[in-house]
Amino acid sequence: MAAKDVQFGNEVRQKMVNGVNILANAVRVTLGPKGRNVVVDRAFGGPHITKDGVTVAKEIELKDKFENMGAQMVKEVASKTNDVAGDGTTTATVLAQSIVAEGMKYVTAGMNPTDLKRGIDKAVAALVDELKNIAKPCDTSKEIAQVGSISANSDEQVGAIIAEAMEKVGKEGVITVEDGKSLENELDVVEGMQFDRGYLSPYFINDAEKQIAALDNPFVLLFDKKISNIRDLLPVLEQVAKASRPLLIIAEDVEGEALATLVVNNIRGILKTVAVKAPGFGDRRKAMLQDIAILTGGVVISEEVGLSLEKATLDDLGQAKRIEIGKENTTIIDGFGDAAQIEARVAEIRQQIETATSDYDKEKLQERVAKLAGGVAVIKVGAATEVEMKEKKDRVEDALHATRAAVEEGVVAGGGVALLRARAALENLHTGNADQDAGVQIVLRAVESPLRQIVANAGGEPSVVVNKVLEGKGNYGYNAGSGEYGDMIEMGVLDPAKVTRSALQHAASIAGLMLTTDCMIAEIPEDKPAVPDMGGMGGMGGMM
């Protein structure tokens, strides 16, 4: 086992604070409407330009082990805030740096770190309650657009496109962000349920212009195994032909004789059918087939529940107003499913989202909810170069998370004003313990730091602006984008309450742990001896 370097007291705490400052100083320059860019070198490809706090934080590793521990703890503040609220990572980092800096003064002066931490925790709890009281609901498209714009570094186009997407697919709908093909941002909305499987044969195409197979008022057959024998399908095909309606077959696969017969029937105009593979794999495939069954009012024909393909009737088939099948996607529009059953299914999936542990599972379950509830919106981010597109995409994703958070817990005045106003809750907070009261004072001063940093990044004088904002009341604050004072909410400078709350809670949590640290242990790097040169190789005998 390698030897360890064990250090104690103020000296090692100072090293930890140095690490905090290096990381926080790199992140804080991105805060506010006039935040600067950070350029990150990449091992492959061009450099990455970003204004996203958590992206900057994740890139930082320091050479000194003790400084690096401090930096990694603040990195945790940024990534935790990002996980919970999706935005506010820079604010959280600035708050953590400020609480640590203020707190260290008191620890060095001989106050009890544990009591300081208790005071900080009590102050944060009071601030969180006050933030809940001053938050107002975020319902209108205009407010959603404003939140999106602020989060995307005052890019109004981004706010507008997110508000439009939310209007079209609902606040619960899935909105994804992709690379665009043009210079402008574009919004694509897929109505109905879409899954990523297309036709199994191009001979099913009946709309040559769009290169899709379009079925009006079709039946939908759902089967969880492969279909290769046409005899299994004949009874149900005959019933569909008598009804004179088209048929979509969704199965694990349709191959061989069965696929050939369907294609021939289609070409001759005997029966309009299209076959596609079922989406997903394994258990997810079964779940998605069940979703489609509920959406279309049919059942999944599965031997597991005692149903067989030969005995299927029209009652087992789902129905829809229209289905469009392309090369890679199938879209079911207006399924004939029962609304109450669809709602029950959505509620069941939401329950699964709450218990899911992995982000991937949550994302897939969220997509299923959106598909059942009515649509998916895709924001295609346009830019002139790949480097610009990456930077823009980061901002759009941040803005999307911020708007979701705003819809969830409401909005407060932006620009660091909400935290200043919430300080009113601390003025009469007395703990009965001098050291804990000092902890409250630490938070009282730290909540000024986001506004100070926003003003500094905009080239203003932080102390002058903070004093002027404190003289005002309510939502009165400083709009760093335009350089004006006034009602922040009326000026459209809004922050989601959830983002402000999580930034404060996570910053205080890690800062409190740092203040109560008295010993740090790191591995001593071993000097590995250089590999000796290989000895000369013996001469080779003459070759014939």
From Swiss-Prot:
Present in outer membrane vesicle formulations which are used as vaccines in human. The keyword Isomerase applies. Together with its co-chaperonin GroES, plays an essential role in assisting protein folding. The GroEL-GroES system forms a nano-cage that allows encapsulation of the non-native substrate proteins and provides a physical environment optimized to promote and accelerate protein folding. It holds the Pfam family Cpn60_TCP1. Its EC number is 5.6.1.7. InterPro entries: Chaperonin_Cpn60_CS (IPR018370), Cpn60/GroEL (IPR001844), Cpn60/GroEL/TCP-1 (IPR002423), GroEL-like_apical_dom_sf (IPR027409), GROEL-like_equatorial_sf (IPR027413), TCP-1-like_intermed_sf (IPR027410). It catalyses: ATP + H2O + a folded polypeptide = ADP + phosphate + an unfolded polypeptide. It comes from the Bacteria. Signal peptide: none annotated. This is Chaperonin GroEL. CDD domains: GroEL. It comes from Neisseria meningitidis serogroup B (strain ATCC BAA-335 / MC58). GO terms for molecular function: ATP binding; ATP-dependent protein folding chaperone; isomerase activity; unfolded protein binding. Forms a cylinder of 14 subunits composed of two heptameric rings stacked back-to-back. Interacts with the co-chaperonin GroES. Keywords: ATP-binding, Chaperone, Cytoplasm, Isomerase, Nucleotide-binding. The lineage of its organism: Bacteria, Pseudomonadati, Pseudomonadota, Betaproteobacteria, Neisseriales. GO terms for biological process: chaperone cofactor-dependent protein refolding; protein refolding; response to heat. GO terms for cellular component: GroEL-GroES complex. It is found in: Cytoplasm. The keyword Isomerase applies. HAMAP family: CH60 (MF_00600). ATP binds at T30, L31, G32, P33, K51, D87, G88, T89, T90, T91, G415, D495. Belongs to the chaperonin (HSP60) family.
